[in-house]
Amino acid sequence: MFRNSLKMLLTGGKSSRKNRSSDGGSEEPPDRRQSSVDSRQSRSGPGGISTESDCAFEPDYAVPALPVSEGDVEQELGPPPSVDEAANTLMTRLGFLLGEKVTEVQPGDQYSMEVQDENQTSAITQRISPCSTLTSSTASPPASSPCSTLPPVSTNATAKDCSYGAVTSPTSTLESRDSGIIATLTNYSENMERTKYVGEAGKELGSGGNLKPWQSQKSSMDSCLYRVDENMAASTYSLNKIPERNLETVLSQSVQSIPLYLMPRPNSVAATSSAHLEDLAYLDEQRHTPLRTSLRMPRQSMSGARTQQDLRVRFAPYRPPDISLKPLLFEVPSITTESVFVGRDWVFHEIDAQLQSSNASVNQGVVIVGNIGFGKTAIISRLVALSCHGTRMRQIASDSPHASPKHVDANRELPLTQAPSAHSSIASGSCPGTPEMRRRQEEAMRRLASQVVAYHYCQADNAYTCLVPEFVHNVAALLCRSPQLTAYREQLLREPHLQSMLSLRSCVQDPMASFRRGVLEPLENLHKERKIPDEDFIILIDGLNEAEFHKPDYGDTIVSFLSKMIGNFPSWLKLIVTVRTSLQEITKLLPFHRIFLDRLEENEAIDQDLQAYILHRIHSSSEIQNNISLNGKMDNTTFGKLSSHLKTLSQGSYLYLKLTFDLIEKGYLVLKSSSYKVVPVSLSEVYLLQCNMKFPTQSSFDRVMPLLNVAVASLHPLTDEHIFQAINAGSIEGTLEWEDFQQRMENLSMFLIKRRDMTRMFVHPSFREWLIWREEGEKTKFLCDPRSGHTLLAFWFSRQEGKLNRQQTIELGHHILKAHIFKGLSKKVGVSSSILQGLWISYSTEGLSMALASLRNLYTPNIKVSRLLILGGANINYRTEVLNNAPILCVQSHLGYTEMVALLLEFGANVDASSESGLTPLGYAAAAGFLSIVVLLCKKRAKVDHLDKNGQCALVHAALRGHLEVVKFLIQCDWTMAGQQQGVFKKSQAIQQALIAAASMGYTEIVSYLLDLPEKDEEEVERAQINSFDSLWGETALTAAAGRGKLDVCRLLLEQGAAVAQPNRRGAVPLFSTVRQGHWQIVDLLLTHGADVNMADKQGRTPLMMAASEGHLGTVDFLLAQGASIALMDKEGLTALSWACLKGHLSVVRSLVDNGAATDHADKNGRTPLDLAAFYGDAEVVQFLVDHGAMIEHVDYSGMRPLDRAVGCRNTSVVVTLLKKGAKIGPATWAMATSKPDIMIILLSKLMEEGDMFYKKGKVKEAAQRYQYALKKFPREGFGEDLKTFRELKVSLLLNLSRCRRKMNDFGMAEEFATKALELKPKSYEAYYARARAKRSSRQFAAALEDLKEAIKLCPNNREIQRLLMRVEEECRQMQQQQQPPPPPQQPPEELPEEETEPEPQPEDIYSVQDIFEEEYLEQDVENVSIGLQTEARPSQGLPVIQSPPSSPAHRDSAYISSSPLGSHQVFDFRSNSSVGSPTRQGYQSTSPALSPTHQNSHYRPSPPHTSPAHQGASYRFSPPPVGGQGKEYPSPPPSPLRRGPQYRASPPAESMSIYRSQSGSPVRYQQEANVSQLPGRPKSPLSKMAQRPYQMPQLPVAVPQQGLRLQPAKAQIVRSNQPSSAVHSSTVIPTGAYGQVAHPMASKYQSSQGDMGVSQSRLVYQGSIGGIVGDGRPVQHVQASLSAGAICQHGGLTKEDLPQRPSSAYRGGMRYSQTPQIGRSQSASYYPVCHSKLDLERSSSQLGSPDVSHLIRRPISVNPNEIKPHPPTPRPLLHSQSVGLRFSPSSNSISSTANLTPTFRPSSSIQQMEIPLKPAYDRSCDELSPVSPTQGGYPSEPTRSRTTPFMGIIDKTARTQQYPHLHQQNRTWAVSSVDTVLSPTSPGNLSQPESFSPPSSISNIAFYNKTNNAQNGHLLEDDYYSPHGMLANGSRGDLLERVSQASSYPDVKVARTLPVAQAYQDNLYRQLSRDSRQGQTSPIKPKRPFVESNV
């Protein structure tokens, strides 16, 4: 009856609310919960917050009925004395006050229950300190809670906030449905299931403890508030404030965007209390604009607004949402935007000096001590304002105009931020010290401020700010926002567990660990790593004394926390703290320097500061001046008197001065008398005066007194709405109207300042204290009654519609206890007041159990509130969310909170209730070492022998942790009952286990105690047995201690007689236990006690094997030193080395091998250490063993080798190591590699490498075998992720095979392989290119052209492709011409030019195609070497096969020259094919390397200017202009040196070029030209002289225009050589007159071409092909004829690009000069520079010395064309004959240079370069040149290739070939005696000359050189190219010849040969050439390419 009536009274008829039954865990049955949740949810707004009843106060804020506990309250409380009496009592006390619930409340005003939750939470968390039960009871009020500091949530935000809360931020997690934070966690999980947010939050919580799913389903409010509320006390969302904006915000922010643990926690203190710990939403809210509505208000609306903000926070850059730490919102009402800071520089100076001092006892921090109002907070705020956090000052300083009476000129900007200096605001005289001193002091202040990284204000009226968890969390949040510590922020973002560690939940559970591991250790590490500045940092803490007001029953205050932690602070992290003088004792443990602000008499600076402030106030206000001046005058005397009087009264208090001046300024004080009697004498009188003025009558004060009472009693700032609701909660009749309330609040606005979050704080802590307490003798007027405020707040919480969250529940309990409204009733009613209070709280909320078990109340319990909760029906056996869902008693036992344990036991908590791990409270207490709690529990008959799930009893737990006293107590306990009950576990077993546990952990005292136990009643069971193993771990004491390395315990045990050989249960003896762990000191101890160093275990393993297996090097070395045998084997035949290898311990392997271990020992399975190491997979061990003689091909009994094992185990690093060491890939290897794509790739790559190696060595057949084998082994399937890699690998293999097949003349297969590659990789331009080469080799020019067009589409910038394309186009034309009767040589040249130029690879192309090209380059070399020109004699001569090294860049130039589009204007590369072609070509060394065939081709073909000289050289192919069209410019390959001579000299450049041997073109053509252009006597070119060939060619038969070989009209042909000087030209001296004549026209032409080429020096060399006499007196024609072949070739070969492209210097050929200007037979000819102009001649002569010249001289004209090209200035040798095969490279080095220049491209550029020389040579070899010459001219392989472009001026390869044979002979025979002398086109020397270096004359040498040239020049293509056309008559020999020609490129290429090439030789050559050309290609020689394919 009583309960019901009371309930009806309180609830206003609503009896739905029930308290949780005290029994079992849940406060209400799950179904009911569910239903209520559902019902609430149904009406909750978004976020699950109920819009109706959720609101703390709905429009009607009737107080919800107090729920009755389900289990009858009577049971717990006992039957009430009399229902009626109790009911009457409550009615009397409460009834009148409560009356009916007030139903109407202004929507905005509704006060949420959340506030209550927060308060409650705080209360729970904190013990009620004597000063304030509130404090202790409430950790932090939720924002919405009446006490909450958080701004109320706006209506829209409400819903969201709530949901946010529901979602539970990490903090909120704390508050779960279950009471308390722990409950929060639990609920949190449930909610998590329901909300994604929750999910995130759960993670964090999870880390802390198990979260129970929130039972938020009960009601929307439940869900919302609950989760929120309960989860976070701080959230107190349930109270209107927090939930609405904060929770929502926090949740939304934290939950949605970040993981739970990252979710921002409401930074409210309450957060940890029963409200959600993680919901610091209120803090967030504070950050946001304050919302007026209470959290409880309709959530949806509130949440809406809040949500948007939250979203902003979440997604906006604001702060990366991932940082979940949220700073507390601090507002300091006493600091306003108008506050002025004056003076006190001395304080900063002293602080700075102390912090920088070297005295470690005081440099860690400073304590600023002063009385209230003395400026401590202002000093801290000043530093904050000037610090990196200065922007947050707006949050600290209050904007409120009422903040202080003085708001006259409120400058919006914080003065603190401006940091006015004392002297700035005061008359200069008033400031202490000189300006310099002041400046230094101000600098000190700014320096200190710059070091501030965090700050914290403790405010007694905002409990959250006084709690340690919030302090830690706030400091961490500010640290990570400090710009100096960005590295710390990044680390928090990188390591989410650190954020979790700093979550409010973690801070509540263990603030010290959180601070140490989340702040101090990371900062220390960052400092060591120099990631943060190496300077001091400062943390500011204001008002340590304020925090004492909220001191918890258990746990630290901020001061005690700092005292314990300061020892862990790094020396560079300083603290500046402030404390009130009266409480300075609390800081005595801090080793800080102290600065006193109130010792006015001792410190003159304080007086000066006060004086400055007074002066500032007087001067800054005319009102003050008027009020204090006597007779309207303000004289110094008056001022001094007033100043002195005020300073005396203030005693140093700035607050007193400020308030007094405010009164004077406003006219409330008028100082007209000199006695100043009206001035208040103390701060108390100032407040009294202010109140008297504000409230003149008692009734006026009575109207506002309830508001002040509520504000004083609240734990945190409340919004106006909350205060309004709280006041109305106490009215029975007629509620206060909102307008009336607002009016009253306005009257208080100067005392209760509105913060940004719309909550109200007292203007100053001193005013709050003045309202509560007065000193003796002071007037008691205006004293407030905090009890009344507590009562109103308690009623307000009771009337909340929704269920209170944990924080609010604890706040409610706090207020109920503080209100104490039943005081004195117990006697009257017969019911104890505590029972009545329990009934009250049980009727007011359902979450008692959850509040009791909230995190904050678990870790910082409020004993009184907890008792109240238990009285109200909280379940004392409620399972928490921590310690494996341990019951509350377990947690309190673990924490050592004796009072709480006693309280729980008093109310009958289950003493043996266990957590999920099976531990009981006794186990927790024993493990933690709390003897008092162990005793308490044992008195309650806790089971001593209870075993947890690990089989450990409390005694073992105590022994494991070294708690001797607990061990002693437990052993003395009575185990009999327990033993009888269980019948299994006996005390003796426990003691034995305890012995092992203590021994393993090294607790010698416990071991000794247990061993010395008395033998009770003669029963040995009591005493532990030293040699027995226990029943738990199976260890003996000695094996346990030895295994854990406990040396002292081992000594003790051995002294006590422990057996050294006594094994444990597994049979392991102590020696093995310790060896396994590597404790060599204990090994030593055991050995000294008789252990055998070589003893073996059951498997035959010795300690040495064990140590080696485990990798303990120190132990291994120690055992070896102690005589351990290194050769012993275990039962498997494994030695110590085998074990070390099997486990991959390199250091041990090294040690054992050094000590003589056998590396070839085989075990019983035949496995050597290397096998085992390969099995393990440590490549370093494998490498070491192989280096030390291990057999790499050893086969074990199963047929496996180390490589096979490594493959089988997929140890790729070992596979690679073994393959590098030469391991063979056998069938087993392939078998093991099956389905291991990574291994297959390695093996196939190895095969490909081997193939590449053979290929480069010229062993094409072997290379092809390797590639074929690799393809055969290619896996059919199972590529998986490696599909792309395998495809690329296969494409490479196919392309390589294609190359090899082409080299092997198997063009069909080559084409087929390239096609397969295309099928695999349709977009592969390399494949198109390879197939085109194959088709070209088989003379399918049209098809090759198609492929090349495709390739050029795919890779438009690849010069190799471009060059080959041009050549193939030229060849196509030539083909057409060939089909017709051999046209005059001129025609082919036309075609040639196109072919000639191969596009020069661009770097990018090079890399992609490089392999191909390089290989081709190599191929060409190989081919050059391998394939001899079929021409019989020629090969040998041409063979001065110096295989011209691939054309060096010089060659390229030549190529360029020839390739110049002018084609017709072919600059003559005067490179002697012969020895000049040698590497030196040197002398000439046009940058282009010796031209490889490729180069030659390019020479013929104009090559892009960018092409290297070699390429230019390559452009040599010129198609001779039609016979009739001499005047026309045709790109024609430079005629072979012989042919060229005449052409060049006589014919216009283009035409002369056209002279190239047309296919039919034969020497005749040259002769013709020669005749035409012969000049009477051509002076010998210096080249010829230099060539050391005195051979002046006797007049060659001048006109032997044989066959179609037409010499161009004797127009001077301009030979453009890239070489700056016309050395080349000069070397072939052409009579100036003749040349001059022709030169001009040519020059003009060439110049234009040159311009195109961009060759700076390119010189037009006139080759006076018009009959002239060479210096020797031969008719110029002859010379021309000889020269024409080369020169023309060269000339034609020059491209614009070629000429200009490379300065001679550019070509690698620095060597150009180095080589003696030997003019190989061909060389001289080719170089026979036709200097058309005197300049050219001069240059050439001068350049002879110069590299350019030397090229000219050395190289046969034909050979050198490439070389010459590089040097535009150098004229090309007139002789074209040899040139045909060769490219002239300007530099003798050209070959080498080419290689150097484009090693990567070797294939491309080098080949091209080489090609020029080679090409002519090839052409010759193929067409008509002697085999030798082709060789010289082209890459060895080139000769085989028939050139479409006139080679050496002969287009028809046949002609060339024919020429070659003759030339071959002749070339050697004829030498250009003078520079004029032209080498016969065929002379091998000339041909080879293009190569930069002169290979040995022998064919082999030639081959070598060719190879080199090819490699360097990369242009072998032309040889190949030409050979098909008219391979040398000899056929394959032609190739050789070309090669030889290239080889000849050495200058060495037997000068003799060249010399022999006398005129007669030349004549013969010409004749032969003409014949050959007429004949056409005699033998189809497949054009061979230089090794480098790039040279087409």
From Swiss-Prot:
Positions with biased composition (Acidic residues): 1391-1403
Entry-linked InterPro entries: Ankyrin_rpt (IPR002110), Ankyrin_rpt-contain_sf (IPR036770), Dendritic_Spine_Reg/Scaffold (IPR050889), P-loop_NTPase (IPR027417), TPR-like_helical_dom_sf (IPR011990), TPR_rpt (IPR019734)
Sites bearing Phosphoserine, chain numbering: 169, 238, 294, 400, 1444, 1460, 1532, 1547, 1581, 1724, 1826, 1829
Residues of this chain annotated as glycosylated in UniProt: 1930
Sequence positions bearing Asymmetric dimethylarginine: 1565, 1578
Domain of life: Eukaryota
Keywords for the protein's UniProt record, in alphabetical order: ANK repeat, Cell projection, Glycoprotein, Methylation, Phosphoprotein, Repeat, Synapse, TPR repeat
Biased composition (Pro residues): 1380-1390
TPR repeats: 1244-1277, 1291-1324, 1325-1358
Any single GO BP term: dense core granule cytoskeletal transport
Region (Disordered): 1-85, 129-150, 419-442, 1372-1403, 1436-1588, 1786-1805, 1824-1845, 1970-1992
Cellular component annotations (GO), alphabetically ordered: axon; dendritic spine; glutamatergic synapse; postsynaptic density; postsynaptic density, intracellular component
UniProt feature, compositional bias: Polar residues: 419-428, 1471-1500, 1794-1805
ANK repeats: 846-878, 884-913, 917-946, 950-979, 990-1019, 1033-1062, 1066-1095, 1099-1128, 1132-1161, 1165-1194, 1198-1227
Entry's localization field: Cell projection, Dendritic spine
PROSITE patterns in UniProt: ANK_REP_REGION (PS50297), ANK_REPEAT (PS50088), TPR (PS50005), TPR_REGION (PS50293)
GO terms, molecular function: structural constituent of postsynaptic density
Family named by the database record: Belongs to the TANC family.
Description of how the protein assembles with itself and partners: Interacts with KIF1A; the interaction decreases in presence of calcium.
Function: Scaffolding protein in the dendritic spines which acts as immobile postsynaptic posts able to recruit KIF1A-driven dense core vesicles to dendritic spines.
Name by which UniProt lists this protein: Protein TANC2
Gene responsible for this protein: Tanc2
